[in-house]
Amino acid sequence: MQPIRARATSADHTAASGPCPALPQSGQASTAAGRAWVFFKRWLANPLQMGSIVPSSDALGSRVAAAVHRSPDGMVLELGAGTGAITAAMIRGGVGPERLIVVEIVPEMAEVLRRTYPGVTVLCGDAWELPQLLGLQAAGRIGSVVCGIPMVLLPLERQQGLIDAIEAVAPGRGFLHYSYCVTSPLSAHKLGLQGKREAWTPANFPPASVWRYTPLAAR
């Protein structure tokens, strides 16, 4: 796949992004403790943007990875990758780094991803602008989408905007979404979606579910 050039934006997942945490020095960001520290400091700066105080667990990551649709030539697009807990799980689960495109709006976290996962295409930008961010190079090549953005915290119109952006780059594919809600984090029918819980794990903090949402028109 040809390198995809990101166009960074000033927009945020929820609102203003708040002050950015300093990136760990030397090799600290490449360790689990270093990545967790970056994540925690970002949570302190903007709790609503993060959705959780700690990165996703290996247990949740393995369930997300198991639910990803695999195809020989399809790319996997991850939105809101944070410091890469789910990214790592998908690689362990057999998704080649060259098939992964991850989007992260926080520059410090995007840099951690680049350092930690060589071979993965890391785009620092706004997931609501996916068509502009990915450009024509990814057209028709996205086979699966994983969303880690805490959509339950967003108003309906913002949720719809993100869903429309996903549909624009991966028509009819839908997306996987992991959430800490007991029930569906999205009002699926209001958003033109069909929702199904794919997995649940109590081994995450907090306990988490993996949902698959597909466009009603695609069923």
Question: How would you name each of these model-derived features?
Answer:
Residues 160-172:
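A short glycine-rich, Lys/Arg-flanked "PGG" loop and its adjoining helix->strand segment in the class I
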Residues 83-95:
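Conserved SAM-binding loop of SAM-dependent methyltransferases across substrates and taxa
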Residues 171-181:
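Conserved beta-strand signature within the Rossmann-like core of class I S-adenosyl-L-methionine
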Residues 106:
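Conserved SAM/SAH-binding beta-strand->alpha-helix loop
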Residues 184-219:
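Active-site capping/gating segments
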